[in-house]
Amino acid sequence: MTLDLSTFAREKGVKYFMISYTDLFGGQRAKLVPAEAIADMQKGGAGFAGFATWFDLTPAHPDLFALPDASAVIQLPWKKDVAWVAADCIMDDAPVEQAPRVVLKKLVAEAAQEGLRVKTGVEPEFFLISPDGSKISDTFDTAEKPCYDQQAIMRRYDVIAEICDYMLELGWKPYQNDHEDANGQFEMNWEYDDALRTADKHSFFKFMVKSIAEKHGLRATFMPKPFKGLTGNGCHCHISVWDLAGEVNAFADNKAEFGLSAEGRHFLGGIMKHASALAAVTNPTVNSYKRINAPRTISGATWAPNSVTWTGNNRTHMVRVPGPGRFELRLPDGAVNPYLLQAIIIAAGLSGVRSKADPGRHYDIDMYKDGHKVTDAPKLPLNLLDALREYNRDEELQEALGREFSAAYLKLKQGEWNTYCSQFTEWEHQTTLDV
């Protein structure tokens, strides 16, 4: 039975709803709707000019309506009179096929048709920086190896604990928070869930972290590589596939190598097969490739892959199998669109299951030290343009995510690359002025 948002508002004391959708570039767009008007919005959606956000639309297109999904409503723990609700984009009474949440829902349904239920957990890393974005906010956070630094995390206790308390209140079951490998960097973990719910939570988490940071006079950034020489922001994703009831893990086989079943290996095989094209979505910005192709950081490791390899419990590879019944994709970064991340994982994984793809040999080596000895594993794209070209060549992935989505994404991202190439940098000035 669909939750009535008007009733929800009366029972919870909600005065306003943020009807929110995510555009192709991961931007979160919303309208603040008074509770008195939510009944009409729940029926027909809140109207937007789609061209004003990152979609391949024109000013001549009719209104884009964001139809709230009442099952995804979240009352803001820090502002109880407001509730956030994820929305699906429609136009002329039909789903907008290029909208990320629409794309994900289609792939979740496809997996269900094959008796599969994808569950995932994400690990979005972020920096707490100065309001102007120029430096790390904690001037004492200067250690060469700051990971798990207890003094540093306690200096940011007020921010981290407040966010964690809110996740506890929301029933997300958070289980750990830590200072990460870069100065000023943090990670907060909560329990895995169905792919769509994970995407909704991921989207809300970014909104919540930024909001609470601002409340404390700080700024939070999920930018993949905000500071030269420091470890970048990853968004590792743990993946498992279950039966439709969510009771039997189809990836688990304690007798198999790494505890990964044949079906799990096939799903992983799809990820490996499509990895270079995946990067166009999992690493969607120019800056993303400063993380996955970075030189050694001050702390000693980038903690990011640069080759298409997998292994057991070893964090130097693109895919890690830390235990039976799941694997971790370490490729995505903090700029990834929460919905497209889940969508492209399902698309690639289903491709592997259908074709019984083999993930290939695994390498039990330190890729940071000995990766140069591996000659039969593809390198990940060197830049956004290379990744877009890989996606453009991957007909199977384009078909799986939808031709309308793929065309729109490639067009807008190519435009972003062209804009980047038109920039005149200080490096050019310094290195070329006197030639």
Curated annotation (Swiss-Prot):
Residues 12-94 form the GS beta-grasp domain. Binds 2 Mg(2+) ions per subunit. Inhibited by methionine sulfoximine, ADP and pyrophosphate, but not by various nitrogen-containing metabolites that inhibit other GS enzymes. SUPFAM superfamilies: Glutamine synthetase, N-terminal domain, Glutamine synthetase/guanido kinase. One of its GO terms (biological process) is glutamine biosynthetic process. Mg(2+) 2 binds at E125, E180, E187. Keywords: ATP-binding, Ligase, Magnesium, Metal-binding, Nitrogen fixation, Nucleotide-binding. It holds the Pfam family Gln-synt_C. Catalyzes the ATP-dependent biosynthesis of glutamine from glutamate and ammonia. This is Glutamine synthetase. It comes from Rhizobium meliloti (strain 1021). The lineage of its organism: Bacteria, Pseudomonadati, Pseudomonadota, Alphaproteobacteria, Hyphomicrobiales.
